[in-house]
C-alpha cells in the first residue's frame, strides 16, 4: 500500500450484468495496517452520479491502537426509492503487524449484514426492510483501497476528491467479491486455507 495508491478493477462482465440486481453480497479480503487518523477508503461499488457509492466500506478514525471503526454505506434502489443505509462496526484486534482476514456479508433475505474477523462472526446488524440489493448507475470499475470520489478521475460526477478522505495506505490481499451470501463455514475455510 501507498498513500496515493489504489486499484481500479474492471467489473467482470458476469457481475456487470448482475450488479444492478445483485441481491446478496460478500466482500472478503486480507488486510494489514496500523491505526488510521483519517477516513480511509477500502472498497466501493460506484454510483456514477451520487456522492456515495452503491456499496462502500471504509475506515473511520477511532483513536484506538488496535480497534478499527468500519463504516459500510449501502445505497439500495428498492421499492423505497433512494434507500440509503449506514452500518458502523467497531472490530477489535485489526491494527498491527499481523495480517487479518475480514469478510462483510449482506444477506438480502434477512436484511442483515455480518462482519467476520479471521473466520469468526464478530458483528451482526439487521437493516429492517432493506431487502435484496439493487444498484443503479453502476460504473465499469470497482475501487479497491479508495473512495469512489478519490480516484483520478473520480468514478462519480457527484463529487471529486475530499480533504477528509484518504486512500488506504496499508496492505490488501486476496480481495474477493461474491454475488451471494457466503456461509460461516465457507468464510472459515477461506481464512484457514489462507486464501
Where are the model-predicted features located?
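Short tryptophan-centered beta-strand motifs in secreted/extracellular beta-sheet-rich domains
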Residues: 98-106, 115
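Acidic glycine-/aspartate-rich tracts in secreted/extracellular proteins
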Residues: 33-37, 77, 108-110, 120, ...
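Flexible glycan-contacting loops in extracellular carbohydrate-active proteins
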Residues: 126-170
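Short hydrophobic/aromatic patches on beta-strands that form ligand-binding or substrate-lining surfaces
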Residues: 27-33, 102-104, 144, 172-177
Amino acid at each position: 500500500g501507498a498513500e496515493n495508491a489504489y486499484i481500479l478493477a474492471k467489473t467482470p462482465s458476469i457481475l456487470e450484468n448482475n450488479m444492478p440486481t445483485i441481491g446478496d453480497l460478500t466482500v472478503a479480503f486480507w488486510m494489514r495496517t496500523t491505526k488510521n487518523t483519517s477516513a480511509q477508503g477500502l472498497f466501493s461499488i460506484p454510483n456514477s452520479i451520487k456522492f456515495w457509492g452503491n456499496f462502500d466500506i471504509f475506515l473511520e478514525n477511532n483513536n484506538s491502537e488496535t480497534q478499527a471503526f468500519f463504516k459500510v454505506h449501502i445505497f439500495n434502489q428498492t421499492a423505497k426509492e433512494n434507500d440509503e443505509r449506514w452500518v458502523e462496526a467497531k472490530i477489535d484486534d485489526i491494527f498491527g503487524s499481523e495480517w487479518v482476514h475480514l469478510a462483510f456479508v449482506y444477506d438480502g433475505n434477512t436484511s442483515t449484514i455480518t462482519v467476520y474477523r479471521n473466520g469468526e462472526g464478530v458483528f451482526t446488524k439487521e437493516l429492517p426492510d432493506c431487502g435484496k440489493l439493487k444498484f443503479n448507475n453502476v460504473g465499469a470499475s470497482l475501487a479497491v483501497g479508495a473512495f469512489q470520489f478519490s480516484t483520478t478521475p473520480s468514478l462519480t460526477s457527484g463529487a471529486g476528491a475530499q480533504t477528509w478522505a484518504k486512500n488506504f495506505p496499508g496492505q490488501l490481499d486476496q480481495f474477493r467479491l461474491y454475488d451471494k451470501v457466503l456461509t460461516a463455514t465457507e468464510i472459515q475455510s477461506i481464512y484457514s486455507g489462507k486464501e
